[in-house]
Amino acid sequence: MKFFLDTADLAEIEEAASWGALAGVTTNPTLYSRIGGKLDDFHAHIKRICDIVGPDCPVSAESVAMTRDEIVRDGRELAAIAPNVVVKIPTMVEGLAATRALADEGIPVNMTLCFTVPQAILAARAGARYISPFVGRFDDI
């Protein structure tokens, strides 16, 4: 089992990377905006994260697109940032279709917002390399 750091904060990523135990990073535009980032700079920020963690550490960057074609287009752009970028896609019907398309192109996908075992199975069947399970989130509200 591997655990990934879920943040957009470069200082947190640098600190975790210095421990030598960082398995990966996941982030999204919402986390980036919480540290003062602007959506227009998100791709550049992903590049900075990739530079910090190095090429052997996967960095999951989330697409905010909502349709299959938009997610695929955004996913291709994200994947072009660095070889260790994993496209993070919400577990929804359009996301499953986009995951299959990207996986068929050899682009790694992390399906997020995965709440149930059946969703995880669907994600795997669609070609996702990773899932980001949300456990206990409803209890936190």
Where are these regions (language model features)?
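Conserved anion-binding
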Residues: 56-58, 97, 104-105, 109-141
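Active-site beta->alpha loop and helix N-cap motifs at the rims of alpha/beta catalytic domains
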Residues: 3-5, 9-13, 19-22, 27-104, ...
